Structures are given as structure tokens and as C-alpha cells.
Amino acid sequence: MIRQATLNDVPAILSLVNNHAKQGLMLTKSPLDIYRNILNFIVCEQDGQVVGCARLVVLWKDIGEIASLAVADGYKRRGIGAELVKTCLRTARKIGLPRVFSLTYQTAFFNACGFKIVDRESLPHKVFGDCLKCPKVDCCDETAVIYDI
């Protein structure tokens, strides 16, 4: 079941995100990062356990980002990630956000969700705020993908 994250979900979200960060797939987050962004997070809960998360971040009036997309080991390849993305896209549509992007290593996954690969330079510079915290800021190897609502 996909649902809005609650404060009780913060430890599980933190674990999911930071486990993926240890694999070099995303940036680490502090508990404060998660608490401050809890309203942006959705989770997938199965059998009382949070097994996936994602957040939709509105960056400007015309663009948002799907970030912190993570699914627990043992639950991958079950469609959970796709459902999290679809839920973020429905929210974007509902609030009138025309474009959503992500920076990812999982281009095939995002292509299957309807995203198209774009040149990172085609994105407005304001979308790269989190990149300043990344050790790969000067040699980013993630691919930019975008979805037009």
C-alpha cells in the first residue's frame, strides 16, 4: 500500500535511503533532512513494514524532482518502485506541476515509467541544489531523465 509518510516512518525511511547511499546510489540523509521533508515523502507499506519510499520535491512553478526513491532488498522487482513513481506523478499532475525530473543510475527503470533521457544542461540550474553536497559534484555520472505531465 502506497501512502503519505508519517513521523513514525522516519527511522525506516532513513534506513532505506542511507542503505542505498552506502551503495553510491544516492546522497545520505540525516534524520533532520527526513523530518524537514516528511510532507514530501510517500512510502510503500507491506505487512506493517515500510519497504519503499520516494519524495516529490517542487523546485519551481514548472519543475519538480522525484528523489530518495528506494526499495528494500528482498522487495525489488515487484513493481513497488514503479508504483511510488506513478504516485509522485499523480501528485504532480494534481498540483499542476508540468514537468518532473530525476537524476539516476537506473535509466531503464525510468524509461519504463515514461521518462525520457535529457541533457543535464537542459535543466534549470536551480534544480542542482542537492548536487552541491555530493562528492561527485564536478564529475557527476548520473543521467537526467524527465517526464512531461
Short names for language-model regions:
Residues T104-D130:
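Conserved active-site alpha-helix within GNAT-family acetyltransferase domains
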Residues L123-I149:
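C-terminal "cap" of GNAT-fold acetyltransferases
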Residues L69-K76, Y105-Q106:
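A short, internal acetyl-CoA/4′-phosphopantetheine-binding micro-motif in the GNAT/acyltransferase core
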Residues V43, Q49-V58, I63-A70:
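Conserved beta-strand in the GNAT
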Residues D33-D47, E65, D138-D141:
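A short helix-loop-beta-strand connector motif used in the catalytic cores of GNAT acetyltransferases and
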Residues M1-L27, E45, E142-A144, D148:
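Short amphipathic alpha-helix that is part of the acyltransferase structural core
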Residues R77-R90, S102:
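Conserved acetyl-CoA-binding loop-helix of GNAT-fold acetyltransferases
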